[in-house]
Every structure is written in C-alpha cells, then in structure tokens.
Amino acid sequence: ALASFHNPGIVRVLRYFRANETAYMVMDYETGQPLQRWLVGRLPLDKTMLLRIVRPLLDGLAVVHGTGFLHRDIKPENIYIRADGSPVLLDFGSARRVEADGSDQALTAVLTPGFAPAEQYHRHGKQGPWTDLYALAGVMYWMVTGNRPMEAFARLREDTMPTAAEIGNK
C-alpha cells in the first residue's frame, strides 16, 4: 500500500519487500536539504512561508491517512526541502496501518520528544491521524518560534510551554 502513494508532499515508495527477516523500502532519492538546515537564518518563519511548507505536507498526509496509514515519526529531521523549495515528508520506516478504533498493530514505540503525542508513549495508546497532526503542529511551533516544543508528558503534568504568539511578541 505504501508504494501506491503518489503525492508531491510525501516521498514516493517504489517498492516494499522482505528479506532476511527484515522489511525494506526502496524510495525515490530526493535532492535538497533537511528542514532544520534549510531554516538556518530563516527562523522564525512568517505565515506565508510557513503555509508554503505545511500545506503540501498536509496534502500528503491526507493521502496517507486516507488509506489507513500513519507516518508516526513526523519531526524536522524527516522533512526535506527540495532544490525547487518544495517540502517532502521522508522516512516511512515507522509507518503503520491503524485500525478504525485507533489501535496500532505495531509493537514498537516510536517517539521523538517534543513531537510525539502522549498516546505514542503507551504501547496500546490509540493512534490515528491526530497523532501525525500533533507532530506536524510541533514542527510548525518550532518553525514559528525557533524552539522545540516541550515533551508531551511534561506538558500534561504542567504546561509551561509559551504560545507561539507569546514568543513572537518578545
């Protein structure tokens, strides 16, 4: 199913296969640079530039989510800015199909503090499109403020993370 995704906002998976008790994906080679390198000297981003990056990623996620899959590891390191300036979401190695009830068939926890929502910290946490959207919102926060978001559980205990508007007004 991953090989059937065709959208400019997500890397194209050409082939998926298993060998030696391991799963492999062959993907398009993308030229450009990682988002965090591309953003050096550009932070914080204004609304126009933020939307130029985020909209194609949201369009790509709509394709992924429409087939019942989740990326599960959206973070700045997995977003590339191509030579033409367009963004592409990479690294579908953690992607999994999720059941309609939000249960995940994966046994592995995938987390990047600040970008992973609370449900990814629990083996049986219910995941859905909201899981990827939380992570993308964390990337947006970082692009607007220049600060990585707080870890989800730290925010659940005591949310001291300043809003993007508060940081922008300093």
Range-by-range predicted roles:
Residues G114-K170:
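C-terminal lobe helix-coil module of Hanks-type protein kinase domains
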Residues N20-P34, W38:
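Conserved short submotifs of the Hanks-type protein kinase catalytic core
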Residues L58-F69:
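Protein kinase catalytic-loop region centered on the HRD/HxD motif
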Residues I53-V54:
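Activation segment signature within eukaryotic-like protein kinase domains
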Residues H6-G9:
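Flexible N-lobe loop architecture of eukaryotic-like protein kinase catalytic domains
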Residues I81-G85:
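Activation-loop N-terminal segment of eukaryotic-like protein kinases
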Residues Y16:
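Activation-segment/catalytic-loop signature of the eukaryotic protein kinase fold
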